[in-house]
A protein has these predicted regions:
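Active-site cofactor/cluster-binding pocket
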Residues: 1-171
Length: 171
């Protein structure tokens, strides 16, 4: 078993919380895990991404080469497109349908969504609405997205749930 995941979004959307929960879930399931993250201008709504590699065999690099990612899990639709060159043929894009329009030249939303919907393996959900309805707060949309991506990540649900709980134990 080996799953290469690219987590993508913008600052404040909880990408690093997803990474922490997935990492905890993998380790508690006796899997190997390597992770690299970039969050330079994240506090100003900039790009945040994490490369996460999970395997039942030792992993020697935390980087994911272009064309090799099994899944792009994105909390923001434009960020899903940004990392498309990393997706392998047959890989899945799992993204939130709600854009975070924080730049003046943000692409036209209809064009963006049409491009995503044209992909052969995609799951597009309105995570913000689901989070607001289920948890009472759109800030939970990151974990809604993690749940949407869970069928493509070979970690049992109970470990994912424990991974989320581990993040919030100290809060």
């Amino acid at each position: 078993m080996k799953t290469d995941i690219i987590l993508a979004g913008v600052g404040g959307q909880g990408i690093l919380s997803i990474a922490a929960a997935l990492g905890s879930a993998a380790l508690n399931n006796n899997l190997y895990m390597k992770q690299a993250e970039t969050h330079g201008m994240s506090q100003r709504g900039g790009d945040v991404q994490s490369f996460m590699r999970i395997s039942d065999k030792p992993i020697f690099s935390d980087l994911i080469a272009k064309g090799t990612a099994d899944i792009i899990l994105s909390v923001e639709p434009m960020e899903a497109l940004r990392y498309l060159p990393y997706l392998k043929k047959g890989g899945y894009v799992v993204t939130n349908a709600t854009p975070f329009i924080n730049i003046p030249n943000y692409p036209e939303v209809e064009t963006l969504m049409a491009t995503l919907k044209a992909l052969p393996h995609q799951v597009i959900i309105d995570a913000d609405s689901i989070a607001k309805e289920a948890a009472g707060n759109v800030r939970a949309s990151n974990f809604v997205m993690m749940g949407a991506g869970s069928p493509f990540i070979e970690i049992p649900f109970e470990y994912l749930e424990k991974g989320i709980m581990a993040i919030f134990e100290r809060k």
